[in-house]
């Protein structure tokens, strides 16, 4: 008996789903998705209207981005500048620097 009750409730729910799908396709009910018109009118050459949440999120993420860039540059600058040793100018010769010898005056 309990199996018949479960089967009847299953058939009832399935029938509701079938009817609601048919009504939605016929336009007699169901979910209304839009009013048929444009919700936001386009504005030619004007900035979009931003909400406070959008402004806060954009400032937060841009601040986070610049923090990450500056942090990485400060702590791992060789990733940007390269892994080259800085040359020691005291080891350069006058010839390499283009300085003429003293006895050629």
Curated annotation (Swiss-Prot):
Feature: transit peptide? 1-33
Instruction: Give the subcellular location.
Output: Mitochondrion inner membrane
List, alphabetically, the InterPro entries matched.
NDUFB2_animal
Domain of life, per lineage: Eukaryota
Q: Which UniProt keywords apply?
A: Electron transport, Membrane, Mitochondrion, Mitochondrion inner membrane, Respiratory chain, Transit peptide, Transport
Which stretches are tagged as biased composition: Acidic residues? 95-105
Any one Pfam family here would be NADH_B2
> What pairs make up the disulfide bonds?
none
Which topology term describes how it sits in the membrane? Answer: Peripheral membrane protein
Does Membrane show up as a keyword for this record?
yes
For region Disordered, the annotated ranges are 85-105
A biological process (GO) of this protein is: mitochondrial respiratory chain complex I assembly
Cellular component, GO annotation? mitochondrial inner membrane; respiratory chain complex I
Q: Which family does the similarity line name?
A: Belongs to the complex I NDUFB2 subunit family.
The record describes its quaternary structure and partners as: Complex I is composed of 45 different subunits.
Q: What PANTHER family does the database record attribute to this sequence?
A: NADH DEHYDROGENASE [UBIQUINONE] 1 BETA SUBCOMPLEX SUBUNIT 2, MITOCHONDRIAL (PTHR15223:SF1), NADH-UBIQUINONE OXIDOREDUCTASE AGGG SUBUNIT (PTHR15223)
Q: What does the record give as the function of this protein?
A: Accessory subunit of the mitochondrial membrane respiratory chain NADH dehydrogenase (Complex I), that is believed not to be involved in catalysis. Complex I functions in the transfer of electrons from NADH to the respiratory chain. The immediate electron acceptor for the enzyme is believed to be ubiquinone.
Protein name (Swiss-Prot/TrEMBL):
NADH dehydrogenase [ubiquinone] 1 beta subcomplex subunit 2, mitochondrial
Q: What is the lineage of its organism?
A: Eukaryota, Metazoa, Chordata, Craniata, Vertebrata
């Amino acid at each position: 008996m309990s199996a018949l009750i479960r089967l009847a409730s299953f058939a009832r729910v399935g029938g509701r789903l079938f009817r609601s799908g048919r009504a939605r396709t016929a336009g007699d009910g169901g979910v209304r998705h839009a009013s048929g018109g444009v919700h936001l009118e386009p504005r030619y050459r004007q900035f979009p209207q931003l909400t406070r949440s959008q402004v806060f999120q954009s400032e937060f993420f841009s601040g986070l981005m610049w923090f990450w860039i500056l942090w990485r540059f400060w702590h791992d600058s060789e990733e940007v500048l390269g892994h080259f040793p800085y040359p020691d100018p005291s080891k350069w010769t006058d010839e390499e620097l283009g300085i003429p010898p003293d006895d050629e005056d």
